[in-house]
A protein has these predicted regions:
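Terminal alpha-helical segments
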Residues: 1-133
Length: 133
């Protein structure tokens, strides 16, 4: 059964229905988990750890959405849909929203450093997401 909120996003064109692909989901889980493991390597630069953790979170969140039979029109929506694709508490998916904004600042506006607290919170939130999958 799908959430009425997800169905509303379909009607608005933000999501589209697409049959789940076990191969795609397995690949997203594999890549997400590998990136999550690498993000925990303290010898890497903080910016690298942030990038790895953010991309791990995105891959795992996309896997959760694909399992429900949907595909998102943009990256941010994958995180917003976690309220309907997982049982994660609000605080966890808000960390992903904060990380998405930080990622855009670093990528598109020339931000020069990653915040260590955010990186650690992002890794923890991504681990919580992985546990649900």
């Amino acid at each position: 059964m799908t959430s009425p909120d997800l169905e509303r996003l379909v009607s608005l064109g933000h999501l589209k229905r697409e049959s789940p692909s076990e191969r795609e989901i397995a690949g997203l889980l594999r890549v997400g988990r590998a990136r999550l493991a690498d993000s925990r390597r303290a010898e890497l630069a903080l910016e690298s750890r942030f990038d790895l953790a953010y991309n791990a979170a995105h891959a795992l969140a996309l896997a959760a959405l694909r399992r429900k039979g949907f595909r998102a029109a943009n990256r941010y929506l994958v995180f917003q849909c976690l309220a309907h694709t997982t049982e994660l508490p609000t605080v966890v998916w808000r960390i992903f929203a904060t990380a998405h904004n930080a990622r855009n600042f670093l990528e598109y506006e020339g931000g020069d450093d990653a915040d260590e607290r955010l990186v650690l919170d992002l890794i923890g939130a991504t681990m919580a997401l992985d546990e649900q999958l």
